[in-house]
């Protein structure tokens, strides 16, 4: 059985653009995510 290729191809720029802090701050829902993570005491708020 042939398996497909690995789907995770790391790329720091894309990671930041898709999950980064500036993207989160753009929308109300994104700000809510960051607020919730701050309240919970997460070490990393965003990627």
UniProtKB/Swiss-Prot annotation:
Protein family (similarity comment): Belongs to the bacterial ribosomal protein bL34 family.
GO molecular function annotations of the record: structural constituent of ribosome
Xref: Pfam families: Ribosomal_L34 (PF00468)
Gene Ontology terms describing biological process: translation
Gene3D superfamilies on file: 1.10.287.3980
Keywords attached to this entry: Ribonucleoprotein, Ribosomal protein
Keyword Ribonucleoprotein listed: yes
Gene Ontology annotations for the cellular component aspect, listed alphabetically: ribonucleoprotein complex; ribosome
Name of the molecule in the record: Large ribosomal subunit protein bL34
Entry-linked InterPro entries: Ribosomal_bL34, Ribosomal_bL34_CS
Organism of derivation: Mycobacterium marinum (strain ATCC BAA-535 / M)
Gene for this chain: rpmH
